[in-house]
Amino acid sequence: MAKEVYDRSKPHVNIGTIGHVDHGKTTLSAAISKVLSDKGYSKATDFASIDAAPEERERGITINTAHIEYETEKRHYAHIDAPGHADYVKNMITGAAQMDGAILVVAATDGPMPQTREHILLSRQVGVKYLIVFLNKADLVDDEELMELVEMEVRDLLSEYDFPGDDIPVIAGSALGALNGEPQWVAKVEELMDIVDEYIPTPERDTDKPLLLPVEDVFSITGRGTVASGRIERGTVKVGDEVEIVGIKEETKKAVVTGIEMFRKTLTEGLAGDNVGALLRGIQRDEIERGQVIAKPGSITPHKLFEGEVYVLSKEEGGRHTPFFDNYRPQFYFHTTDVTGSVKLPEGTEMVMPGDNVHIDVELIHPVAIEQGTTFSIREGGRTVGSGIVAEIKA
């Protein structure tokens, strides 16, 4: 028998489970997988194999993450479950797991706990726009009023972080009950996935987004002009397209793409993920450099001031051995280049220890093409000491 071919007919969505430790994230992940596999949509992944999440390295940071996949009638899902709280934080901040939406698991027996709050805040910062609440362990709560109280608390907490707390779907159930095949709880997991299908919109595909091509290398071809090469991060580029060259320099330049090459072959169009060389008309060799981006006109602008959510590597991960303080000046590696910047710590934070995550204000010495959701590394002399994501552009 041949292996199954990956079926692209269903739209693909990335989701994950978030919430406080021991509230049942991994049990719910296993239950969803089992319930959908019993319907014949996908193979089940059991609790033990999700819990024994393999170690991955993303930009020098060690993260344990379990990836499972499953299908509903309407969609194909990739589902991320990060076992430990630190893994979850690293996952969100490094962009290792980019989620289109997430299921917030809250134990009805406990209500919202500190990590519930932190995960909601992080979801807001890194741009996970759609959350659905699963009130777990409902089989252990007999008191209807208590359930309503927990639901109200969760909704208030969501509203506090600018999520639509009143409108977010909330389902009460038992992940363990569903995993054990108890019909009333299986039905709740089925209902949860119907809501996930409906509530989380199908994301725009990378190729449908505006062009972004970070420049890695620049060279001139005598008689033809300047070529900039790099990997297309998103969007598409066609011969004849007008583009902008953004970042590093104060002035944004316009150019026209007159040729595209990949592996020494000529293309009419480059797509997200392709490593291409783009021949640019109207640009001198010294007007473009590594670290700039080639973008669809008007789609991205250069900035120096931003707020970032940052994870600082621990000593064991090869990070700093000592804390850093206000006005720390490392390099920020965006796209393809390092730019020096100075760090302002939040009020009341004296210092940041290796292994911490922190919200910082950064001022760069050059403007860089960035937007909310752009990821970066923090480096000292070429060594990565932290990883972050742009939460908000200031100027």
Swiss-Prot record:
Q: Where is this region: G1?
A: 19-26
The residues the record assigns to binding GTP are 19-26, 81-85, 136-139
Q: Where, subcellularly, is it found?
A: Cytoplasm
Q: Which residue stretches belong to region G2? A: 60-64
Taxonomically, the superkingdom here is Bacteria
Ranges for the region named G3 are: 81-84
- The UniProt record lists the tr-type G domain at 10-204
What HAMAP family would the database entry show?
A: EF_Tu_B
Q: What is this protein called?
A: Elongation factor Tu
